[in-house]
């Protein structure tokens, strides 16, 4: 038996549906546009890998680290970070091909370093510090702070984010006071000097190394 709704009732249903869809898309947009939610969501995904996939660390470490890379890779603006690591002097000295090559080299080495470091933290928790005001989520550059709790110690993490056409992307990370961007830039400059500012040789010998950032 079919029910026949009168016009006012249909209009009410349409209005409620419209409001629901507006709220849904507003929440989706807020999640995409809010850098704190962006960082926190991905951090919790990493925590799940660290805890739920702990056994995989012993049986297949490469796969374990790849799961971390899959989360972390889309979060970073590698082109901007790589250019910053090269510094203005060496970026201008490098050819377009060498610049593009370093983006790939730096990306692989950074992901390997980050995944290997995270893998050693094991059963940890990460807490994001949300601001009282949401006003700065509409800015182009934002700093998001977190606290890593390894069980025995707590360490501060600070993400520097910049909004581009793809959304929010990480452009620098400071872990326990160690500025990774600055550390890598100093390494690049030292390596370039060692190789008489030969960019090709510098790229061939590049290895991202930030130690354990004071976390153990």
What are these regions (language model features)?
Residues 154-182:
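Short beta-strand edge/turn micro-motifs at domain boundaries
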């Amino acid at each position: 038996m079919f029910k026949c709704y009168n016009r006012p009732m249909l209009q009410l249903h349409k209005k409620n549906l419209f409001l629901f869809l507006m709220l849904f898309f507003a929440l989706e947009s807020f999640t995409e546009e809010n850098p704190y939610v962006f960082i926190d969501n991905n951090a919790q995904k990493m925590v799940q890998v660290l805890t739920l996939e702990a056994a995989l660390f012993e049986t297949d470490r490469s796969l374990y680290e790849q799961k971390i890379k899959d989360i972390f890779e889309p979060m970073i603006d590698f082109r901007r970070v790589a250019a910053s690591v090269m510094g203005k002097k060496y970026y201008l000295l490098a050819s377009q091909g060498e610049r593009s090559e370093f983006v790939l080299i730096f990306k692989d080495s950074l992901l390997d370093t980050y995944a290997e470091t995270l893998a050693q933290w094991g059963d940890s928790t990460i807490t994001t510090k949300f601001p009282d005001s949401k006003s700065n989520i509409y800015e182009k550059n934002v700093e998001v702070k977190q606290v890593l709790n390894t069980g025995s110690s707590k360490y501060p993490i600070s993400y520097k984010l910049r909004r581009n056409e793809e959304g929010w992307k990480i452009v620098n990370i400071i872990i326990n006071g160690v500025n990774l961007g600055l550390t890598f830039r100093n390494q690049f400059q030292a390596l370039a000097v060692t190789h008489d500012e030969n960019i090709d040789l510098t790229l061939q010998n590049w290895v991202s190394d930030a130690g354990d950032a004071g976390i153990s």
